[in-house]
Amino acid sequence: MSDTQDNAPVSAQGVDQKAAAGCPVAHDSVTAHGSESESPAIDSPSAVGGGRPRTNRDWWPNQLDLSVLSTNSAKVNPLGEDFSYAKEFAKLDVEALKRDITEVLTTSQDWWPADFGHYGGLMIRLSWHAAGTYRIHDGRGGAGDGGQRFAPLNSWPDNVNLDKARRLLWPVKQKYGQKISWADLLVLAGNVALESMGFKTFGFGFGREDVWEPEEIFWGPEDTWLGDERYVSEKEFSAGVGATEMGLIYVNPEGPRGNADPASAAHFIRETFRRMAMNDEETVALIAGGHTFGKTHGAGVADDHVGPEPEGAPLEAQGLGWMSSHASGVGADTISSGLEVTWTDRPTQWSNRFFEILFGYEWELTTSPGGAKQWVAKDAEAIIPDAYDSTKKHKPTMLTTDLSLRVDPAYERISRRFLENPDEFALAFAKAWYKLLHRDMGPVSRFLGPWVPQTQLWQDPVPAVDHELVGAADIAALKAKVLESGLTTTQLVSTAWASAASFRHTDKRGGANGARIRLEPQRSWEVNQPEQLATVLPALEEIQREFNAAGGAKISLADLIVLAGSAAVEKAARDAGVEVTVPFRPGRTDATQEQTDVDSFRVLEPRADAFRNYLRPGEKTQPEVLLVDRAYLLNLTAPEMTVLIGGLRALEANAGGSRHGVLTDRPGVLTNDFFTNLLASGARWKASESTEHAYEIRDVATDKVKWTASAVDLIFGSNSQLRALAEVYASEDAREKFVQDFVAAWTKVMELDRFDLA
């Protein structure tokens, strides 16, 4: 099989990467070549003799890939299921840890010498690049799991020689063991580096737990490093990616596609930083603040001297890559990006010199010793110190993307304000840096350690509990009130699901806590059925008011929405002949509109929610692929996904009143009818001639339509793995198991954002 096959795989990294590209699974309109290797830029392995064993993916490249739902299972975790990072971290002396990191920063090693005698610039880049992969549209990327240790991130061109930074930190990690995760250490190193060079940071939160295999993420359609097939026009690239080229964190520092045009570069800087949740002020602060320190490395031509990246390096390299044959290959002879730029004359001290130098000179285009396009100050004295020879000085230099901060009108206004107000710049950088490092960590309730600052708006704050929580008798009384309210099982279940299922385990956003289902923008999302919410929410608010007015314990609307849905599930199970109690743990609170950044929350609106049989109009990606993506964001296993689909179909929880997949004569009753009727003989399925993504099940004898369904429904009979799961729940002895498993999965979703229960 060639690497450029017509039937591109529906992979765990992407979808039909050729047509839809994105998700763990994939998005929108970029194209790909369907590389068969884990990393799009690494050739497929070959077996001895020229061939290689063929996998199921080779034989059936469009087969739905469920593997993403079982990554990082307990089987790959060497620490065991009982390990608690929070408990181990509690034993850590964080001040001693900081001292040890500082000692690493200021102790130059012969095998990889420190620029200017200080590894600060290197560690800032390490932390920035660990966190900077975060993207708002699906919450993937970021520093939250230490994924930079693994392919493909450990071998991205933009991460060249960061393997050395991690190796420098190994003695610290080795000393403290499991008290500090790699994920925390990778970003703490940059924070400590800033402080060691005189900068006052905004704060720091520990709590990132390591993974033991990389998260499957669609980084782009290209099969070469620095490829740019993601562009759909000169000024636009696919919405499903975060950077402008494969293997970059943001943009090409030489300019778009190597074109040294600062104005054009500004357009792409703005877009890539927006996709990382940064506005213009935060963008300027981050670029200028980060480039106050350290230097880039381009002592020679990389193609002539630099060896393979870590994942492609030989065994004896022991995980290190990019070995250089240029002179000594290290220190003054280092080749990383190919650019040779030192931004300020105080590269190991916090200062405002970046802006002073940026605006203090006119700039002309030149090339580095490595042949990369960069800029040098016109008619300037040599004021920039050499990183290794104290007798040498250099003229000021800048990157094309640095000049964007002066050329772009909006960036220039901010930059000049920072130039004239250094304290304002310092605070802006401190806050933006804190946001960069913590954007994918969720609410501050997940943070550990003594340096956590006050909650910021971008952390989706919810109030603290300020009332007595309901007990068992209160819960029983409230359930009775809900079931007497006239609201239907379908209304209660679908509202609770809508409230909870906005959660994304990728960046720990969304969920039922806060009751933001009643606030904008979630209240107006089509998938949440605003007209139904206009009936359900006032009825629940009235029950809440009456209960809270009685004195004693109180209940938040966030808790009541979940409790009401759970009461409906219990009733539906009872109607099916199964008695069950849905676990309920109070403690959610109600956020206000002022605590809710509308623009920030818009990215949580689902393009599809297969659990409600919802597909955004015009969506091009296969619905069944988006099902797996949604299940992944909800941190569900394949069995949990399966039982939830069957139960929610039985409960008529579809968006917009759709009847697709409601394969039962007893809607609203928690039966396994979805599975029994889906797998029943004596019927044939046919694509609808009138409705896109719809199918009809017809009686073989009469040809009459018995049911309608979506592609998501049919996949549970079509895909062999999902059919195996469906058969479990379609069996005659599965009635109680189905209900119990549904309740367990339902409760899991309702509590996905209850970090206080961990």
UniProtKB/Swiss-Prot annotation:
<feature type="active site" description="Proton acceptor">
    <location>
        <position position="129"/>
    </location>
</feature>
<feature type="region of interest" description="Disordered">
    <location>
        <begin position="1"/>
        <end position="57"/>
    </location>
</feature>
<dbReference type="GO" id="GO:0070301">
    <property type="term" value="P:cellular response to hydrogen peroxide"/>
</dbReference>
<dbReference type="GO" id="GO:0042744">
    <property type="term" value="P:hydrogen peroxide catabolic process"/>
</dbReference>
<feature type="binding site" description="axial binding residue">
    <location>
        <position position="291"/>
    </location>
    <ligand>
        <name>heme b</name>
    </ligand>
</feature>
<comment type="similarity">
    <text>Belongs to the peroxidase family. Peroxidase/catalase subfamily.</text>
</comment>
<feature type="site" description="Transition state stabilizer">
    <location>
        <position position="125"/>
    </location>
</feature>
<dbReference type="InterPro" id="IPR002016">
    <property type="entry name" value="Haem_peroxidase"/>
</dbReference>
<keyword id="KW-0575">Peroxidase</keyword>
<dbReference type="InterPro" id="IPR019793">
    <property type="entry name" value="Peroxidases_heam-ligand_BS"/>
</dbReference>
<dbReference type="GO" id="GO:0046872">
    <property type="term" value="F:metal ion binding"/>
</dbReference>
<feature type="compositionally biased region" description="Polar residues">
    <location>
        <begin position="1"/>
        <end position="10"/>
    </location>
</feature>
<keyword id="KW-0376">Hydrogen peroxide</keyword>
<keyword id="KW-0560">Oxidoreductase</keyword>
<comment type="subunit">
    <text>Homodimer or homotetramer.</text>
</comment>
<dbReference type="GO" id="GO:0004096">
    <property type="term" value="F:catalase activity"/>
</dbReference>
<comment type="function">
    <text>Bifunctional enzyme with both catalase and broad-spectrum peroxidase activity.</text>
</comment>
<dbReference type="InterPro" id="IPR000763">
    <property type="entry name" value="Catalase_peroxidase"/>
</dbReference>
<keyword id="KW-0479">Metal-binding</keyword>
<dbReference type="GO" id="GO:0020037">
    <property type="term" value="F:heme binding"/>
</dbReference>
<keyword id="KW-0408">Iron</keyword>
<dbReference type="Pfam" id="PF00141">
    <property type="entry name" value="peroxidase"/>
</dbReference>
<protein>
    <recommendedName>
        <fullName>Catalase-peroxidase</fullName>
        <ecNumber>1.11.1.21</ecNumber>
    </recommendedName>
</protein>
<dbReference type="InterPro" id="IPR019794">
    <property type="entry name" value="Peroxidases_AS"/>
</dbReference>
<feature type="cross-link" description="Tryptophyl-tyrosyl-methioninium (Tyr-Met) (with W-128)">
    <location>
        <begin position="250"/>
        <end position="276"/>
    </location>
</feature>
<feature type="cross-link" description="Tryptophyl-tyrosyl-methioninium (Trp-Tyr) (with M-276)">
    <location>
        <begin position="128"/>
        <end position="250"/>
    </location>
</feature>
<keyword id="KW-0349">Heme</keyword>
<dbReference type="InterPro" id="IPR010255">
    <property type="entry name" value="Haem_peroxidase_sf"/>
</dbReference>
<dbReference type="GO" id="GO:0005829">
    <property type="term" value="C:cytosol"/>
</dbReference>
